[in-house]
Amino acid sequence: MAFSYNYSLQASYPSQRAYVPYQQTQVPTPSPIYSLPITNTTTSGALSPSSCFLSVRQQPKEALVTVKGKEKFRKPLDPPPMLELKVSSDIDPSQQFLQNPYLFVSVSLYKHDKDEPIEGTPFDVLAGTLVSSLHRLKDVNNKDGAFFIFGDISIKVQGTYRLRFTLYELQPSYFTLSDLEQHKDLERYQGAALDPPEYGTYQCLGHVLSDKFNVVLPKDFKGLEESTYLSRAFSDQGVRLRLRKEARGMMSNKRSISGSGDLTSDQSQQQQQQQPLAKKRREDSVESANPSSLMSGFYQNVSPFVNTPYLQSQGLQGQTLQNQGLQAPVRHDTSYAWNLAYDPSFMG
């Protein structure tokens, strides 16, 4: 019976086959992520130079020359130049240009007496952000407008100049997936990387020149002026600008007045009257915490000979407090120290 039992056990559990891992016969190709717009199309309702009106809303006045190698300590052009773009309502009745992401303005440095640029590339004479995209902001009259703001421009050459602002619109061209595949096939055929296909062109919509401004040395620089109302209005709407509450000259005058030691009695009295109340309270608390002032007032108000029932019971009648070596009352336990000289029932 034992033999048949073992045989039945083996028959119920047949031998397992060897594990064969799953092998994928064909590698799946990922679906393309390229968008498929219409080939060689441009933005509908493209702007024209005759329909755009670019104006300078805020003119620059003065700039501190930027020393080569010390660009970290440069000062921006003050006040920051701001431009406004207006489009004829006949061309764009719904004012769609306010949401146009393809509009931008570039800046270059020009001579003050001629319509000619300064020799050299823009990066040789200018520093900072030289291109601004369109900002849709509320104007001072609470109406939407298209603005280009240059809040970080510095000049590297000393003299008198003007800024030329040029308005451009990018006109993108779109390619289908087949166009991209043909470009890749051509690269593999030639065995070298080719220039990427042109995804668009741009057109110039106009330009405008700013007023003359001076670029001075540090010894002649008067400091940044107080920020204008327009700068504050745009800064409150999220535009990154450096704001200043008051002019640098006014701040230096205040420092010189406060640091002078030969003040008259009227000036010192006026400063004491303008002293904050919290500071006066701190001085009063320091004086009241002085042990000598506490004890002087205590001995002036209390007779040198104290006759109380408690002192009579302790045999201290008719003796002074100083002779008994009583400690001066401390500020945090004044009530307890005073009760040593009076009846303990004073506590209850």
UniProtKB/Swiss-Prot annotation:
It holds the Pfam family Velvet. Disruption phenotype: Reduces the amount of thehalose in conidia, tolerance to heat, oxidative and osmotic stress. It comes from the Eukaryota. Keywords: Nucleus, Sporulation, Transcription, Transcription regulation. Component of the velB-VosA heterodimeric complex that plays a dual role in activating genes associated with spore maturation and repressing certain development-associated genes. The complex binds DNA through the DNA-binding domain of vosA that recognizes an 11-nucleotide consensus sequence 5'-CTGGCCGCGGC-3' consisting of two motifs in the promoters of key developmental regulatory genes. Regulates spore viability, trehalose accumulation, and tolerance to thermal and oxidative as well as ion stresses. Positively regulates conidial pigmentation and pathogenicity on barley. Residues 250-294 are annotated as: Disordered. This is Spore development regulator vosA. The keyword Nucleus applies. Residues 253-266 have a biased composition (Polar residues). The gene is vosA. GO terms for biological process: sporulation resulting in formation of a cellular spore. Induction: Expression is up-regulated in conidia. Its main location: nucleus. GO terms for cellular component: nucleus. A motif (Nuclear localization signal) lies at residues 274-280. It comes from Cochliobolus sativus (strain ND90Pr / ATCC 201652). Residues 46-244 form the Velvet domain. Forms a heterodimeric complex with VEL2; the formation of the VEL2-VOS1 complex is light-dependent. The N-terminal velvet domain contains a NF-kappa-B-like fold and is involved in DNA-binding. It is found in: Nucleus. Belongs to the velvet family. VosA subfamily. The keyword Transcription applies.
